[in-house]
Amino acid sequence: AIILFTSMTAYYLTRVKTGVTNVLYYMFVFSMIVPFQMVMFTMSKLANMTHLNNPPGMVLLYLGFGSGLSVFMFCGFIKSIPLDIEEAAMIDGCNPLQTFFGVVMPILKPTAITVAILNAMWIWNDYLLPYLVIGLSTNYKTIPVVVQYLVGSYGAKDLGAMMALLVLSVIPIIVFYLTCQKYIIEGVVAGAVKG
C-alpha cells in the first residue's frame, strides 16, 4: 500500500507544479524530521479513540508514518525521468493512469523495491508503534512485542525461547533481501550522480 500510494503521490507532486503541490511536498519532507517520540502519545490516544488499534488500523498508521521518506525518494527519482517518454505515451492514446502504470511505474521499479525493503525492515522490526497502539491486552502482537513478553519479572529471561523467536524473525528479512538484492543495487546505482 505504501508503494502504490506514495509513488502516485510523488508522481502528481512532481509533474503538477502549483503552490499547493509545493506545500504538500514540503509537508512530506517535514514529516521526516519530526521524531516519532514527539507525536507518539497523541497518536496513541487518537488511534484508540478512532478504533485504529487493530491490524487494519496499523496498516493505515504505517502508511501515514512511512509516506514521508517514500514520497521523498520517489520524487527524487521521478524528476530524473524525461517528460518525452510520458508525452509519447499520451500521443499514443494513454490516459494519465495508463501512462503512470504502463510507462512510469516500470521505470520506478528499482526505487520501488528499495522503498519496499526499507519499509518492510522498519515495519517488521518496529516495537514502539504496535506496543503503544495495539497494547498488551489484545491477541494481536508483533514479534518484537512477544520477545519483550519473554522477559519475566525481576529480570528472569527465557533465553532459549527468545533466541529461537529472534532467529525466526530474522529469516524472512534475509530471504526478502537476498531475493531483491539485484534491484537494491540497481536502485543505488540509479540514484547515483553521474559524472
Residue positions per predicted region:
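A structural signal for multi-pass alpha-helical bundles of membrane permease subunits
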Residues: 1-195
